């Protein structure tokens, strides 16, 4: 265990990739663990503060999906797909010795949570969804595809704030210039 109270763990996917997750153990036995699933371009670190709070009363697992964070890159772009991610997560749970979880998912992680609940209801005790719902509008998908993987280097904080505003401003129309710089 490291100084921040989690264990760095890896498991092997069905197609041989080394995939990473953080395991935040809990001293209280018998409570349902939580599986926290990040958004499209995010990783397990998004849930660190949540996990540290949850750890007082339950175990928490946070993966880096394939090709992100500490997980190995998949050379086959067709495997960056929700069905593949769900299969990877089933192997993660088996590796961690977990049969049933409460899911917390942000954006893509919320979609994966819904897929797990629909395809493996015996695994999903409940779900908390953030930044996603049962329907995803085509306009939202087009907006996301317009900026994912297209970040350009910036020379100043002002340029960085402008880039963030161009990508996320539609979701936060009331944010001021000072908010984007914060």
Segments from the language model and where they lie:
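Short, well-ordered alpha-helices that flank and scaffold nucleotide-derived cofactor binding pockets
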Residues: 49-52, 56, 91-94, 118-122, ...
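Active-site loop/oxyanion-hole signature of alpha/beta-hydrolase fold enzymes
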Residues: 49-52, 62-104
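N-terminal cap/lid segment of alpha/beta-hydrolase-fold proteins
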Residues: 1-19
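Conserved hydrolase catalytic core segment
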Residues: 99-138
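A catalytic-pocket lid/entrance helix-loop region that shapes and gates access to the active site
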Residues: 124, 130-159
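Conserved alpha/beta-hydrolase catalytic His-Asp/Glu region
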Residues: 155-182
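Active-site acidic short loop of glycosyltransferases
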Residues: 16, 30, 56, 97-100, ...
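Conserved HGGG/HGGXW glycine-rich cap/lid loop of the alpha/beta-hydrolase fold
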Residues: 17-75
